[in-house]
Every structure is written in structure tokens, then in C-alpha cells.
Amino acid sequence: MFGIGKKKAYAEHMAPQWMKILTDCRDLVNKTADPDVFFPRYELLKETAANLASISKYVKFRGTKPAEVLKMAQEQEEAATRDFILRSFQRALLGAEKAKTAKGKRSQFDRFLEKLEPYYCQMSAGNAKLVQQLHADAIKRIGG
């Protein structure tokens, strides 16, 4: 009995904090174009959803249940990563438009590729190929 009471108190204490983390992560992964933000925050989102799911028998949640949020995060990870890649490429395109020289334009697209390469292991083969294809097409367009 004592163990359950402690678990419930812990769950009630942690739930609001984990909900805030979950909300912050959701907002960041849906808006950022920085891979150093996107990938760690997506992992934190899944971890936090799992934590919330583990305490759901002690705390009532309104709206979507934490286990469902975790399932959606796992199922939609590839699509979310693709959306992120396209946002990141858009940022590179904007930078290239502002650049005055072909070298400056190319450096925007090279930076796009270089920043994403370390994260290939965290994305599907299709998304890694998308990054490479976007880079190759952009370099072709500027005559590189």
C-alpha cells in the first residue's frame, strides 16, 4: 500500500513537468530547421511520452492519452523528419538567394548537407536519400 501511495505522489508531481517538456518538444520539432535541435528533441519527446504513459494509471489525463501520443510519435517519425528536412532545405534556399556569388550559394547547400550527415543514422534511408537529392539538385541548378 505504501509503495502505491509513493508512486501516485511521484506521478502527480512529475506529470505537469513532463507535460510541459512534451509540449515544448512538440513545438520545437514542428518549427525548427536546426538538426541539432530537431533530433535530440524528437528523442526527448518520445522518452517523455513513454514516462507519461508509465504513470497514466496513477494520473488522469485529458485529451489524447500518453500511450497514444507515444505511438503517434513513433509512427509519424519518418514524416516529421521529412518535414524537418524540407524546412531545413528552405532555410538553405533563402540563404542562397541572399548570397551574391555562386560560391556563397553553394556554401549554403553544402552546409545543409554537412549539418544533416551526422544524423543519417537517425533517419530512414528514404529521408537520407532525400537530403542527398535536394543537395545534388541545388548544386546542379547553381552550376556546380
What are these regions (language model features)?
Residues 1-6, 59-61, 142-143:
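Short, aromatic- and cysteine-enriched interfacial helices/patches
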Residues 4-50, 89:
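Short terminal alpha-helical segments
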Residues 26-27, 40-122, 130, 135-141:
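Long, low-complexity or tandemly repetitive, helically biased scaffold regions used
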Residues 1-9, 100-107:
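Short Lys/Arg-rich cationic patches that frequently serve as NLS/NoLS or arginine-rich RNA/DNA-binding motifs
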